[in-house]
UniProtKB/Swiss-Prot annotation:
InterPro entries: DUF736 (IPR007948). This is Uncharacterized protein y4eB. It comes from the Bacteria. Keywords: Plasmid.
Length: 104
């Protein structure tokens, strides 16, 4: 599996703030908690300035670690970008990690 850190974030009172960097993106971003999420709807919305850039769902791993499952999408993207926002041992704050499964 190919993996890359495409963003770094710090926790805030009602979400996270940080930046997302890829070859196509270089933006400051805010992940804001949704006050009353629906059962299957996202728990967070992701913004670059005033523009909504995606959504995130609160999840728990098999190792009992909390993380956010992130979907970034924009009309300028050829396809949505899926990533995980998680704490990484030895790193400050939270890392937004993109991964592409191997196609054997």
């Amino acid at each position: 599996m190919t993996m890359a850190t495409i963003g770094t974030f710090t926790s805030t009172e009602n979400g996270f703030t940080g930046s997302i960097r890829t070859l196509a993106l270089n933006v400051k971003a805010r992940i804001g908690r949704i006050e009353n999420p629906s059962d299957k709807g996202p728990h967070f919305r992701i913004y670059a300035g005033a523009v909504e850039l995606g959504a995130a769902w609160q999840k728990r791993s098999e190792q009992d670690r909390d993380y956010l499952s992130v979907k970034l999408d924009d009309p300028s993207f050829p396809a949505p970008i899926y990533a995980t926002l998680t704490e990484v041992e030895g790193e400050d704050g939270y890392q937004l990690i993109w991964s592409r499964p191997n196609r054997d």
